Amino acid sequence: MTQATIALFTGDPAGIGAELVQKLLDQPALRPKASILLIGQQGAIRTTADVRWHPWSGIDAPAFEPGIATARNGRYMLDALAEGVKLVADGSADAFCFAPLNKSALRLGGMHQEDELRWFAEFLNYHGVCGELNVLQNLWTARVTSHVPLKEVSQNLSSSKVCDAIKMISNALKAPQVLGRTVCP
């Protein structure tokens, strides 16, 4: 069986992404499960021979100031996300995964969408329902709202958004048992 290739972006270069990716790569038992193709700053992570770097325009980017959201790291993240999508689209990778992003920096860098999922939808010219699925063992949930303060949840609810979340999870699962539940930010 051919090993899957996962393009893995190290996330916000001013954040904890590289540290989290390093912790993942430091678990040797996980590496035989997939071939990892890293997207990020080459100097940010120690790698072994079985982990490859994708040679993209940001591989040798100058250091970013830790913990500071700027247009520069926002643009860097958007460019890296686009690079990851292109790797899957052209068959160079089977999947794309990314470490945490900084939404403030993404907006400063030019993202005008609500979040990275809507950015992906626009980038891919996708016009269907778009949202998050959360999985915990056999429990799958779809969010009606996401990343909004609790005090703003009720004003962000609508029957069409609830229906969209139900349609999304129903389409994602083969034989879903859909249960409506209480408000959760």
Where are the regions a protein language model picked out?
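Flexible loop/hinge segments that line or gate small-molecule binding clefts
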Residues: 114-151
